[in-house]
Amino acid sequence: MNGTEGPNFYVPFSNKTGVVRSPFEAPQYYLAEPWQFSMLAAYMFLLIVLGFPINFLTLYVTVQHKKLRTPLNYILLNLAVADLFMVFGGFTTTLYTSLHGYFVFGPTGCNLEGFFATLGGEIALWSLVVLAIERYVVVCKPMSNFRFGENHAIMGVAFTWVMALACAAPPLVGWSRYIPQGMQCSCGALYFTLKPEINNESFVIYMFVVHFSIPLIVIFFCYGQLVFTVKEAAAQQQESATTQKAEKEVTRMVIIMVIAFLICWLPYAGVAFYIFTHQGSDFGPIFMTIPAFFAKSSSVYNPVIYIMMNKQFRNCMLTTLCCGKNPLGDDEASTTVSKTETSQVAPA
């Protein structure tokens, strides 16, 4: 074993020299230089500064503008709530622990931080899945005369919470465990050892298949069908400038969605899968830390992609920020979201 395993931690550093200390009791400066911990803290501070205002503003703008309270936006609001969970449940804790160089809140704090960070991340991930399905059903119309309504949105939101809890809760009750990861300043599920006494192998397989591979397949399928449908509609209406514009907008939105999903989650999932399938191999804390912290940036990407690219929401946000006056004019802001729920090609 190239790491040092304790009862509730795994430090990716051999203890042959006797320098390894519990990440709950002492700074981990033998894993990385102090300035590197400071860089992590600065990064988390940046995510808090960017993530909190835009997600909070999303909730506030929706309360202020009644026309935004549509079924589709229920999912977008759920996404904002998930991102706020990550900001308050994970980012603030990680900022504080990074400044100290170790996880100062102990095993109980690690469980709480790991749970809330995982819960927020999973709610966000499954919200993206629900959005993908909603766009597929509305635009591609696999079921004739189906209209995405309030009840469907509520069921979608409930589904995201059920799936998120199904991933975040098991480590709290003995199926796997939350431990400090990478540079030992943030916590996540254990994937470094098999740990048969807590059935860790089965949990990691379950998490990778159900909470990563399946969402990825669903998102690619739905948006692949979406692009195909828009292109087909454009081919049948060559003169339609509206359709041509819709094709470009939807295609651009889909490309950004897929790229952002891969950028945020594929490196983390890939590293976790590699470590899990190469037990005993040599890997350093930086190798584990960078993908995990990069995945956290989804709290900033999400509102930019799924809300800022929504013209109506963007204009309502500008109206709120500019004290009731939209500097871009009122025509675009008056477009209703219901249009996107009945159109075959219009993006959200």
Curated annotation (Swiss-Prot):
One of the Pfam families matching this protein, by short name: Rhodopsin_N
Extracellular side: 1-36, 97-110, 174-202, 275-286
Location of N6-(retinylidene)lysine modifications: K296
Subcellular location: Membrane; Cell projection, Cilium, Photoreceptor outer segment
Membrane topology type: Multi-pass membrane protein
Assembly notes: Homodimer. May form a complex composed of RHO, GRK1 and RCVRN in a Ca(2+)-dependent manner; RCVRN prevents the interaction between GRK1 and RHO. Interacts with GRK1. Interacts (phosphorylated form) with SAG. Interacts with GNAT1. Interacts with GNAT3. SAG and G-proteins compete for a common binding site. Interacts with PRCD; the interaction promotes PRCD stability. Forms a complex with ASAP1 and ARF4. Forms a complex with ASAP1, RAB11A, Rabin8/RAB3IP, ARF4 and RAB11FIP3; the complex regulates Golgi-to-cilia rhodopsin/RHO transport in photoreceptors.
Protein name per UniProt: Rhodopsin
Gene: RHO
